[in-house]
Curated annotation (Swiss-Prot):
It comes from the Archaea. The keyword Ligase applies. DNA ligase that seals nicks in double-stranded DNA during DNA replication, DNA recombination and DNA repair. Also has low activity with dATP. Inactive with NAD(+), CTP, GTP, UTP, dCTP, dGTP or dTTP. Keywords: ATP-binding, Cell cycle, Cell division, DNA damage, DNA recombination, DNA repair, DNA replication, Ligase, Magnesium, Metal-binding, Nucleotide-binding. It comes from Saccharolobus shibatae (strain ATCC 51178 / DSM 5389 / JCM 8931 / NBRC 15437 / B12) (Sulfolobus shibatae). Its cofactor is Mg(2+); Ca(2+); Mn(2+). This is DNA ligase. ATP binds at D258, R265, R280, E310, F350, R427, K433.
């Protein structure tokens, strides 16, 4: 399969803003792709060489390296490449222009012929894999040579998207949800197969793997798919409510209640003597927690399992729980074994999804928890999450306050009974979180995605000082603007922010972003931040839940303030528009005269 086919589709996709059109065009590309390498095609569409959970290196090519490779491939001096980059802001476009110029001025271009061999997807994939995996002395020069070699063989359009792929900025506006729908259309007979494909992806979060199974065995093979150790399951997510009475009513009057820990959610896999740890974002974080690997190996019985819990920093002296920030300090230390001594952790397990070749995601919570409790040996490091069973509001409140006093964030209220299955990848009422932040006027903090930036004034003149934030709408696979946040940042954070955002700025709005407000710069929807505010208000300036509460208006956060970055969350893990609406409906309402100026921006 020629790489040119993918490049041509990327060129079309880049110019489309309609999700329906994106999905249809992507389905067309998938249906025309070589079935033998369909997994590689899917990974390339995702902008990666392999799933994040494998823990393999990323391409790791900086701007200077790319400029050097483009210079070599197009026989252009580096200064000229840099100047063109300054004027376009897009190295992919630079490569396209220089390759076009090279073709038109060459003798073969003059004659209107070409002897160039076609660049294949296999060649691109294998060469870029070498680039990513090459390490050691001389690796820098080898990476540049390999990349320059690809660019030499590429035509202008191929060069454009090769460079963008290496940069990690394809800019074609495709999320995983769109790929899933396209796969259902291309291989499953239509949109009706989306649920089957999505269920499979929820159990095995590897789109390339799912695509390969479909083309080799058919859509029916996905219906009986089980979790596989080593491939993470998409985590089950909780709804949120602030009223204990309503929570108990939602779960049927009786529930299992766990502490909600202020740590890092972890999915732990074991197969024989190998143990893998995956983050909430399904990234392989095994190397960050060699102590947890040792604890699981020693204290959890079984040859093959997938379990879930929270890794929590604890005081080495008292054993009391520390805040989430302590884990972040640990991650920043270069010597992991020194970090283990300074920031020890405990693991609090709360679920089991797979055990000795049996899929437990379809079994009730009580069955899963009973088995989990039976396989954990008594020890000081790996424990079952603190929990009780409640059937009245008083016990729920009492346990909630206890969790807070012991350093937790609140509690997780979980439905029990035969229907209380593990809903992989879904947010539903089987789990409901009650956090201490609910005591404020705005019921909870929210996790929002950065989609734009605004320049400041005075000492922040010419630098980013506030951000346009958006919530995720899973129904449309888009990000809808919620607020403009300018407070809560330190000067150091703002300086760091400037650097981070300049690397992913865009000339035009991302096709997955829905915003009336025009920031000074548009940003790729990559970073997630935790935000708190005074209340959620109706706003004509924002698109979150547009026309749902009031015609021609959306919902916004009044007086928003930055709390922290949520590096453990992907953009699709951000607070959803439905959750924002739910929070708005639950908060106390005050009748205010219609203001001429909206304060929520």
């Amino acid at each position: 399969m020629e790489f040119k086919v993918i490049a041509e589709y990327f060129d079309k996709l880049e110019k489309i803003s309609s999700r329906l059109q994106l999905t249809a065009l992507l389905a067309d590309l998938l249906s025309k792709s070589d079935k033998a390498i369909i997994d590689k095609v899917v990974y390339i569409i995702q902008g990666k060489l392999w799933p994040d959970f494998l823990g393999y290196p990323e391409l790791g090519i900086g701007e200077k390296f790319l400029i050097k490779a483009i210079s070599i491939a197009t026989n252009t001096d580096e200064n000229s490449v840099e100047n063109l980059y300054k004027s376009t802001g897009d190295l992919g476009e630079v490569a396209r222009r220089l390759k076009s110029k090279q073709q038109s001025t060459g003798i073969l271009g003059f004659l209107g012929t070409s002897s160039k061999e076609s660049l294949t997807v296999d060649e691109v994939y294998s060469t870029l894999s070498k680039v990513a995996l090459t390490t050691g002395e001389g690796s820098r020069d080898l990476k540049i040579r390999l990349l320059a070699g690809l660019l030499k063989k590429a035509d202008p359009l191929e060069a454009k998207f090769l460079v963008r792929f290496v940069e990690g900025r394809l800019r074609v506006g495709i999320g995983d949800a769109t790929v899933l729908d396209a796969m259902a259309i291309a291989f499953g007979g239509g949109q009706s197969a989306s649920e089957i494909v999505e269920r499979a992806y929820n159990l095995r979060a590897d789109l390339g793997n799912i695509a390969k199974i479909i083309v080799e065995k058919g859509i029916e093979a996905l219906k009986t798919l089980k979790p596989e150790v080593g491939i993470p399951i998409r985590p089950m997510l909780a709804e949120r409510l602030s009223n204990p009475e309503e929570i108990l009513k939602k779960v049927g009057g009786s529930a299992l209640v766990d502490y909600k820990y202020d740590g890092e959610r972890a999915q732990i896999h074991k197969k024989s003597d190998k143990i893998f740890i995956f983050s909430r974002r399904l990234e392989n974080i095994t190397s960050q927690y060699p102590d947890v690997v040792e604890y699981i190996s020693k204290y959890v019985e079984g040859k093959e399992f997938i379990i879930e819990g929270e890794i929590v920093a604890v005081d080495p002296e008292s054993g009391e729980m520390r805040a989430f920030q302590e884990l972040m300090h640990r991650k920043r230390k270069s010597d992991i074994y020194e970090a283990i001594k300074e920031y020890p952790v405990n693991v609090f397990l709360f679920d089991l999804m797979y055990y000795e070749d049996v899929d437990y995601t379809t079994k009730p919570l009580e069955v899963r928890r009973k088995l989990l409790e039976s396989i954990v040996k008594p020890n000081d490091y790996v424990k079952i999450a603190h929990h009780i069973q409640v059937n009245n509001v008083e016990d729920l409140k009492s346990f909630f306050y206890r969790a807070i006093s012991e350093g937790g964030e609140g509690v997780m209220v979980k439905a029990i009974g035969k229907d209380a299955i593990y809903q992989a990848g879904a947010r539903g009422w089987l789990w409901i979180k009650l956090k201490r932040d609910y005591q404020s006027e705005m019921a909870d903090t929210v996790d929002l995605v950065v989609v734009g930036g605004f320049y400041g004034k005075g000492k922040r003149g010419g630098k980013i000082s506030s951000l346009l934030m958006a919530a995720y709408n899973p129904k449309t696979d888009t990000f809808e603007s919620v607020c403009k946040v300018a407070s809560g940042f330190s000067d150091e954070q703002l300086d760091e922010l400037q650097k981070k955002l300049m690397e992913i700025k865009r000339d035009i709005k991302h096709p997955r972003v829905n915003s009336k407000m025009e920031p000074d710069i548009w940003i790729e929807p990559v970073y997630v931040a935790e935000i708190i505010g005074a209340e959620i208000t109706i706003s004509p300036l924002h698109t979150c839940c547009q026309d749902v509460v009031e015609k021609d208006a959306g919902l916004s956060i009044r007086f928003p303030r930055f709390i922290r970055w949520r590096d453990d969350k992907s953009p699709e893990d951000a607070t959803t528009t439905d959750e924002i609406l739910e929070m708005y409906n639950k908060q106390p309402k005050k009748k205010i005269e219609s203001p001429l100026v909206d304060e929520s921006v």
